Design a protein with these regions (language model features):
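Short, solvent-exposed loop/turn elements at domain surfaces
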Residues: 43-44, 51-53, 64-67, 278, ...
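Positively charged n-region of N-terminal signal peptides that target proteins for export
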Residues: 1-7
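N- or domain-start disorder-to-order transition segments that initiate the globular core
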Residues: 24-53
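Charge-rich, well-structured scaffold segments of protease-associated domains
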Residues: 92-241, 258, 308-443
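Bacterial N-terminal signal peptides
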Residues: 8-19
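His/Glu-based metal-binding/catalytic segments typifying zinc-dependent metallopeptidases
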Residues: 47-49, 56-59, 242-298
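M16/MPP (pitrilysin/insulinase) zinc-metallopeptidase core fold and M16-derived inactive scaffolds
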Residues: 56-118, 184, 295-311
């Protein structure tokens, strides 16, 4: 797993790119906000038909930006290890899941740790029982620990020669400096070397906190059965032990960075200040961002830089939000001979939208994409459980039927007025054979 510009090993990357936080107004989806007898809350959607259940759990404030400064990479290593543990009888948990055809995964992003599960309804109790062991005390073999640590080190070494990852890391370094928001999921070789099995166990004890747990359940199982199984499986998890917080980041915007890399291509990344998800205008920012660089060939940036100027095969942009930091980011791939021209065209296009606004066609395509793309996600049991967790994490209510109206109601006047204040200065980083952007910060 590697910490990519728009991914950050994001568990929800497909959800976010599909626009699954908006909902078609003609879909009738009954979401129940349930509390078990033990006080475990979850959102539940019963889906009859196939005997399948999908469940997603998120443990807040367990992501890699919360890694101790001298243990960077711990969260990623810990979440990759705990699913490879054994039962108290010494049986491989991964093998037990596999034998029953259960899909199970533990992952981490910048903010949170996640557990995903997809199983036949008849195996749900069994699967949750094993998850309860995984989250509390399933033994981790020393040999497996060494193998996983070496694998993560290998990823770090590989990333050191990947131009996209180099660009991302340098952008984080310039924008965030030494703040936790600059951490990479894999950590550093030096920090990872000092991580022990005891650190992994401490991570498990501290971060799998019932008070930080968010759950989404979709499938063919009764609410009563799901509640009973959750109470039994998670009975040994603690409450209140995770007290970690991350403050607001100080953003360094308007700077230029450069990483020398011998290649005929340049990778150029951009970052500007954005707004947090809780901002009442966030949905307007989503529409604007989608129109600018989130619609593939239909986006404003692709039309200008690829179709008209022919200086890139791919340019895109999007909103990036983590705890304490909100950015509008972009990435441009171009030949080293057109890198300067590409940056100038990118900034000129953004400035044009800032001053003149979007046209009606761009707005309509962006709104339609945000509204209609959710249909695909909501038609799938597994992705829908992720959507339910995403909504809870970001403060939405269980009544999802009015969400698409937020996007449909955005007018051309509103988005263009918003663009005047939203689009500002950029920090820019280039990775390539030549410093085409007059960068003063180099690596």
């Amino acid at each position: 797993m590697r910490n990519k510009l728009f991914g950050h090993v994001l568990f929800f990357i497909s959800v976010l790119f599909w626009g699954t936080h908006c909902f078609a107004s003609d879909m009738k989806i009954d979401i129940r906000d349930v509390k078990t007898s033990a006080g475990i809350g979850y959102w539940y959607k019963q889906k009859e038909g196939l005997p399948l259940v999908s469940m997603t759990m998120a443990f807040k404030n367990a992501g890699f930006i919360y890694d101790p400064v001298d243990k960077k990479g711990l969260a990623l290593l810990a979440t990759s290890l705990i699913s490879r543990g054994t039962t108290k009888d010494g049986e491989s948990i991964a093998k037990l899941f596999q034998e029953k055809g259960i899909i199970f995964h533990v992952s981490v992003d910048s903010d949170n740790a996640y557990v995903t599960l997809k199983t036949l309804s008849e195996n749900l109790d069994f699967a949750l029982g094993l998850i309860g062991e995984v989250l509390v005390d399933s033994p981790i073999d020393e040999e497996v620990f060494v193998i996983e640590k070496e694998r993560q080190k290998s990823d770090i070494r590989r990333d050191s020669s990947d131009p996209g990852q180099l660009a991302h890391n340098m952008l984080n370094k310039v924008v965030f400096g030494d703040q936790p928001h600059a951490y990479d999921a894999s950590g550093t070789l030096d920090a990872l070397e000092g991580v022990t099995i005891e650190d992994v166990e401490n991570y498990r004890r501290e971060n799998f906190d019932l008070d930080k747990l968010v759950i989404g359940v979709v499938g063919n199982a009764s609410e009563e059965d799901v509640s009973r199984m959750l109470d039994k499986a998670l009975a040994r998890l603690g409450r209140g032990q995770n007290s970690k917080v991350i403050g607001d980041a100080v953003l360094n915007i308007g700077l230029r960075g450069y990483v020398a890399y011998d290649s005929p291509q340049s990778v150029i990344v951009f970052a500007a200040k954005s707004i947090p998800r809780k901002d009442p205008k966030y949905h307007v920012a989503e529409v604007l961002s989608s129109a600018l660089g989130g619609m593939g060939l239909s986006s404003v940036l692709m039309q200008e830089l690829r179709e008209k100027l022919g200086i890139t095969y791919n340019v895109r942009s999007g909103l990036y939000n983590v705890e304490g930091a909100s950015l509008f980011q972009g990435i441009l791939f171009t030949d080293k001979t057109t890198a300067r021209k590409g940056v100038e065209a990118f900034l000129r296009t953004v400035q044009s939208v800032k001053e003149k606004g979007l046209d009606k066609r761009a707005l309509e395509i962006a709104r339609a994409k945000l509204v209609s793309s959710t249909l695909f996600s909501l038609s799938r049991t597994s992705s829908m459980s992720q959507v339910l967790v995403y909504l809870q994490l970001h403060g939405f209510s269980a009544d999802i039927h009015n969400y698409s109206a937020r996007y449909e109601s955005v007018t051309l006047e509103e988005v263009n007025e918003f663009a005047k204040n939203f689009l500002g200065d950029f920090t820019i980083v280039e990775v390539g054979a030549e410093n085409n952007i007059d960068a003063t910060i180099t690596s």
